[in-house]
């Protein structure tokens, strides 16, 4: 997984563990995917949690729009009912705020609303492809500040570490008019009711492998998962710069004056 059980709370309850987030153009809108429950997708969704897609339309790493999915406890057949809310403005950053209900349904069913929103929540095959030899080589290079050594990798023998495994997925397809911007920033979070009027953010995820490759354990995975993207530059900028600076010299060569590439 690109974001697999990287906090103590996520390890305790994989229903709150985000493995990957995907964003792409669909047939009739933008598709948002949040995968959770890596390697244990039969546990469903937590009934006291918020599963949220945060959308930044202002290029300031602050949500202007949030799609929130909540679930009720599992029924005797194992399925759960869910509600999708849309929150805008100040409500998009307030977990105690109420939004406009966009859709409702049950897990394992595709729901399509009159305004074109499509929703699915349920089990799915894990689409994340990762070859163990390649990721080990990259992690070793970042750790040691050395060139990436792929001498042991044969592309013809590439093997997916997660072939045949499942996740629990939340998939939204949202028409452009409900997003309101052509360029957006997106991340997903899970948060758990603390029973004291607040919410404890358990996991966050956006681009794959960021927390794994750059080893944010130096600052603490739990700290990373509890913070927001708007604070990343201050919290993790030096860490990322240091690791990239150590890796770049061994993997590049200085240009020769007057030389041309052939």
Predicted regions and their residues:
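Surface-exposed extracytoplasmic segments
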Residues: 1-262
């Amino acid at each position: 997984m690109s974001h697999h059980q990287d906090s103590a709370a996520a390890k305790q309850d994989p229903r709150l563990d985000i493995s990957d987030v995907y964003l792409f153009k669909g047939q009739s809108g933008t598709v948002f995917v949040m995968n959770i429950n890596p390697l244990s997708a039969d546990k469903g969704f937590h009934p006291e949690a918020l599963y949220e897609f945060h959308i930044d339309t202002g290029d300031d790493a602050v949500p202007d729009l949030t799609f929130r999915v909540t679930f009720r406890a599992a029924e005797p057949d194992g399925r759960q009912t869910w509600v999708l809310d849309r929150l805008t403005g100040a409500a998009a950053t307030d977990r105690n705020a109420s939004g406009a209900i966009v859709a409702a349904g049950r897990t394992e069913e595709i729901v399509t609303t009159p305004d074109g929103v499509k929703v699915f929540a349920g089990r799915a095959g894990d689409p994340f492809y990762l070859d163990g030899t390649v990721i080990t080589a990259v992690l070793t290079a970042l750790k040691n500040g050395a060139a990436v050594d792929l001498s042991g990798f044969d592309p013809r023998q590439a093997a997916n570490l997660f072939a045949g495994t499942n996740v629990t997925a939340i998939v939204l397809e949202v028409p452009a008019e409900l997003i309101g911007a052509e360029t957006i920033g997106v991340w997903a979070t899970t948060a758990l009711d603390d029973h004291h009027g607040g919410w404890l953010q358990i996991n966050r995820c956006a681009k794959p492998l960021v927390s794994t490759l750059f080893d944010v354990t130096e600052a603490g995975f739990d700290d990373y998962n509890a913070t927001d993207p708007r604070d990343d530059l201050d919290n993790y900028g030096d860490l990322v710069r240091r690791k990239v600076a150590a890796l770049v010299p061994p993997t590049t060569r200085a240009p020769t004056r007057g030389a041309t590439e052939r």
